[in-house]
């Protein structure tokens, strides 16, 4: 639909077509949601469900993008991106596709798995969880290494960070690694405290800033 903001408040939403708005779009669900088509808004896009989200296609917003669910799976070749991007899984977020945005915040209550073809990008990027796995994967004999990269500053708040086999944590600005994301001098989603365990095995942690 076009020409106005749209709100979909429903138990469930299914289909492999396009759900688009040339302004804002808000979708609230209580069951699992599988996005196999395109979910896009020229303005703000809010997608939340008390169930799980499985994205095998495209979720994008021209302005703010907010996605939240119990568990989120962003498959290889799938894309979640906004001008500012906020993604939260109450339990686990698994990414083999692309997550991108200007200022990007990716959080999960328990675990973030960025695997193989998985890329999590942002201008300023904050990643917060209990366990962060940034790991490689071999499919059909081809090994791919995962990447978490910020064009400006990178903040990672996690108790356990596993950066494995040629996978990369990269910041073109400053990099801060702590035990959680918090607020510093009025700025939110900054790494605070200390991570308990950092396993960096044959992998890269690199900052061109501080």
Predicted regions and their residues:
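Short, T/G/N/S-enriched strand-turn elements that build extracellular solenoid repeat scaffolds
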Residues: 1, 14-20, 33-40, 53-60, ...
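Short "repeat-start/strand-capping" segments in structured domains, especially the N-termini
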Residues: 2-6, 21-25, 40-45, 60-65, ...
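GD-rich hexapeptide-repeat beta-solenoids
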Residues: 9-10, 25, 51, 65, ...
């Amino acid at each position: 639909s076009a020409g106005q903001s749209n709100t979909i408040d429903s138990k469930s939403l299914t289909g492999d077509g396009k759900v688009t708005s040339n302004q804002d779009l808000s979708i609230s669900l209580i069951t699992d949601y599988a996005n196999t088509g395109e979910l896009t808004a020229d303005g703000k896009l809010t997608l939340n469900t008390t169930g799980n989200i499985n994205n095998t296609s495209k979720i994008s917003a021209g302005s703010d993008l907010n996605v939240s669910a119990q568990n989120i799976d962003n498959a290889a070749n799938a894309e979640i991106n906004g001008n500012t991007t906020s993604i939260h899984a109450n339990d686990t977020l698994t990414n083999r596709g692309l997550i991108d945005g200007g200022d990007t915040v990716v959080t999960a209550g328990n675990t973030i798995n960025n695997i193989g073809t998985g890329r999590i990008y942002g201008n300023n990027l904050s990643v917060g969880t209990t366990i962060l796995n940034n790991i490689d994967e071999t499919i059909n004999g081809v090994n791919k290494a995962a990447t978490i990269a910020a064009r400006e500053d990178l903040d990672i708040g996690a108790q356990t960070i596993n950066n494995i086999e040629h996978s990369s944590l990269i910041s073109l600005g400053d990099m801060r690694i702590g035990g959680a994301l918090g607020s510093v001098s009025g700025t939110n989603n900054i790494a605070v405290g200390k991570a308990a365990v950092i396993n960096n095995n044959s992998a890269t942690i690199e900052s061109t800033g501080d």
